[in-house]
Amino acid sequence: MHEAWLPREHPLHRPRHGAKQYVALVCAFLFFAAPVLAWTLGARAKPLENRPLASFPSVTEGWGFFTGLNDWASDRLAFRPQAVHAVEGISEGVFGEPAPHGSEPGGTPVGGGGGGEQPPSTPDPALFPDVIRGEDGWLFLGHDVSYKCLPDMELDRIITGLRRWRSVVEASGREFRLVIAPDKSTVYSEHMPDEYVGRDCMRRLRSEFWRRVPEATGAIDMRPTLRELDRRRDDPVFTKIDTHWRHAGGLAMVRRLAESLDPGVTTTWKVEPGRTYQHRADIPALVGKDREWTVRSYSLAPDGGADNTRFLGSDFQEPLRLESRARPGMIDEPTRMIADSFTQFASPYLAASFSDITIAHPDNVLSDPEGVGRMLAEGEVVTFEFSERFLAGGRYAMLAPDMAERVGEILKRNPV
């Protein structure tokens, strides 16, 4: 018998819903109903972080349906950017310091050293800030740290997944290339603060990641190229306020990729300064600020003649197809690429130097493995570009063994 059905004078009687319970139920209803009501009134939420909005959880996920509702509702609050901006303004205006945004004041930072009690083996995700403020105005994405301290996959499993993808691609007669775009906090670690949440656990995994993954998977390690490029430039390859490399980094990646496929092919390239335009920085948006940085692009003539770049904005959620007439200095084998946002700053130069290339987002492999398999089967070269934080953190679901197997079956039926 439920306690609420007992007589009120019974010592075990408990009302089904007390006053506090009703308040909690009303608050929960308002929280989850607010996105629906805002959508009905015409308000639309926009991505605040460097990722798509969380999708509505499926009822087939069991308890995952209920745990996923929080992310869905939070992401779809149309006034979320204004709320973040208000919190930041109050914190700086009243208290004279930035809002913590997930960090917890006081105590020893998780993974931050400093002696005392040992940190828990599994740090609380709420301790990690969205943004890490470095010296001289440098801002770093908090996921550079949190994903390494709270990885979804062990490094051995990540390496196994990458090797399996290489195996299924090469077994079909195709060439395979993997490029790793390093985190800004890796390339410019000297601008990180001395103390921050997760410092030690991030450094440990980062060191092991770069020591093992390129050698074990045959990946193209962009770190030496970017450091040499930075040494020869007046401006850093990354801006202080965005988590992505500039076009100079994207162009350097394309050059490394082309040379790996056809050594010497870039000797005829003519690269000159191109147009400039303003681009919204992604990191300040996480603390409610709207800042822009000046993008300096390039022209690229693969044969030393006319510029062949094309600027087509895309997040690759819808595959981007780029074709042009083959010229000297170009890779003319059909190439199919899985890439994330770092390649957005490289796509003009891929268009200039690859006569037939299609780029799709890693999320597409999970949502439509058959469609991605058919796309990859159109190419003779398959290339992956993965960012360090997502790869080291095991955040690419396509690294699961069944994903490579499903796509590999399609490639096997369509050999080169």
List each language-model region with its residue ranges.
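Extracellular glycan-modifying ectodomains
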Residues: 1-416
